[in-house]
């Protein structure tokens, strides 16, 4: 009786729950999963090299960082479900302590884009905001964008999400940033950028980090 009931329930499944021929083909394609694993390892290698060059840059820089900042802390993360897509990222420099954050995240978001972002909250944020205004033209025009999202963990780009940091937007950006206890400035690049094919992700990340240093200098 239990088996009959179970079978009866199975036969009531909606057809949209069945695998399509294309979906079956993907599930059966072992090369697809092997290729995915190769890509994961290659991206990790690129992020590890980026960590190495960022560590070198950090050791040569005098920056306004939280008192308990530890330059040895680093985080490599791999996941599957950032809006249904895989992702890999490096956090370095990395500082998360309660409501205090000062972290540079390098994110490879499969199916979307590369994102290099400086994330700051609490601590020296007031000085970082002042540096943003005082040194605006050292930061503007470099392909950076200010996040408009109410959360630091939104990674989309474009209208309603980000505002490009261009020389003609100083007053507008200063007004947006005024009074904020946290903010994020990011550079977005398509995944088909030539640098991805040429293994230059570490170069892009380092250049973005350097472009943000005026925010962090005393």
PLM features: residue spans?
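N-terminal amphipathic/basic-hydrophobic helices that include classical n-h-c signal peptides
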Residues: 1-9
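Long, solvent-exposed, polar/charged low-complexity segments
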Residues: 11-58, 161-218
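Phosphate/nucleotide-binding catalytic core
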Residues: 11-14, 68-77, 110-113
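Mature, function-bearing regions of proteins
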Residues: 33, 37-40, 52, 65, ...
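Short glycine-rich, low-complexity/disordered patches
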Residues: 54-72, 141-155, 215-218
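Aromatic- and glycine-enriched beta-alpha-beta binding-site module
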Residues: 81-141
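A structural detector for beta-sheet-dominated domains
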Residues: 93, 147-149, 188
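Short, internal acidic amphipathic alpha-helical interface segments
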Residues: 123-178
């Amino acid at each position: 009786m239990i088996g009959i009931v179970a079978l009866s329930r199975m036969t009531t499944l909606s057809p949209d729950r069945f695998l399509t021929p294309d979906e079956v083909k993907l599930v059966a394609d072992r090369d697809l999963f092997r290729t995915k694993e190769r890509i994961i390892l290659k991206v990790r290698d690129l992020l590890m090299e980026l960590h190495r060059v960022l560590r070198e840059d950090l050791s040569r820089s005098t920056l306004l960082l939280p008192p308990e900042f530890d330059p040895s802390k680093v985080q490599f993360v791999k996941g599957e479900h950032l809006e249904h897509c895989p992702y890999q990222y490096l956090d370095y420099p990395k500082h998360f302590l309660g409501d205090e954050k000062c972290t540079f995240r390098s994110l490879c978001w499969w199916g979307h884009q590369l994102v290099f972002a400086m994330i700051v909250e609490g601590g020296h944020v007031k000085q970082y905001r002042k540096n943003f205004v005082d040194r605006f033209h050292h930061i503007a025009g470099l392909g950076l964008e200010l996040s408009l999202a109410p959360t630091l963990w939104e990674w989309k780009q474009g209208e309603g999400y980000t505002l490009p940091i261009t020389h003609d937007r100083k007053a507008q950006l200063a007004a947006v940033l005024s009074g904020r206890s946290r903010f994020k400035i990011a550079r977005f690049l398509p995944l088909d950028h030539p640098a991805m094919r040429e293994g230059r992700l570490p170069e892009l990340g380092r250049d973005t980090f350097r472009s943000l240093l005026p925010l962090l200098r005393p």
